[in-house]
């Protein structure tokens, strides 16, 4: 009889994408030997996934595993990766080795989801290559942010490139604008965001949920390529080997400053906020105030607009696009 497992994790959506790799790896390594369900904060990530079977934690035959990734605690000094950290933990929990799954495309879409027009098609009445742009950050967690003004400069520098700005309404996002930008902040639920990424040519963001979706969601056939363009403005908060995904342009400054000379600093905020939160005890060692008054970590300021523009241009110059696919 297959063993019944419920994987429990109540962290952020990006963490759940990494947990999904562990779930996929388990089934690929031991096909037919496990029946699995999840207890998570964002259940919609697992919709359309054939590996999910509804189970009850009250069933005595069900084992509930609280999913963690303790390898993060040694990620500055060991060659651990976020994508396989949950897998290593799950292997320890079941007492069996698990071979990591294919690195990309583990979030399936239903046939009906693939068949719908993209959100950009609804706006422009045609399909175009576009980039999903996440320029925001969590309201209480600011250390991952790039300059909001530079995001606007990026949009302005690429007038022939279409962008769709996304993000959760409860987070902090700049009000970007331009004839080449469609603003959809607060207008997508999880499945809508997945479909938006599915139909996109690329994703530009900080270290975030959309960054993980860029390679976890399959590439659309119209782009005639097996991976999605993925540019992340990362700085030096995390060790680059920990976060970087497949075919991923991960713009980091690890090793360039004393505060991230060996791995990431893992700080929470750029400067203290007036909320008495414990995150005020984890502050950037090199905060810089931009001309508009925004505080940004120096490791992020070191990444110029032109660094991102050149990568976007390189991708677009090699675009092989078939809108009818």
Describe the residue ranges of each PLM region.
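Mid-sequence helix-capping/hinge segment at a functional interface
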Residues: 72-148, 323
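Active-site regions of enzymes building and remodeling cell-envelope glycoconjugates
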Residues: 50-74, 173-187, 245-254
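Residue-level signal for short, function-critical loop segments
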Residues: 11, 137-139, 236
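Active-site and donor-binding regions of nucleotide-sugar-utilizing enzymes
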Residues: 1-87, 192-202, 210-216, 220-223
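Structural beta-sheet core signal
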Residues: 6-7, 38, 133, 165, ...
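Catalytic phosphate/metal-binding cores of nucleic-acid and nucleotide-processing enzymes, i.e., regions
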Residues: 7, 117-133, 187-188, 204, ...
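Donor-binding and catalytic core of enzymes assembling or modifying cell-surface/extracellular glycoconjugates
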Residues: 17-20, 143-242
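Nucleotide-sugar donor-binding patch of glycosyltransferase catalytic domains
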Residues: 215-324
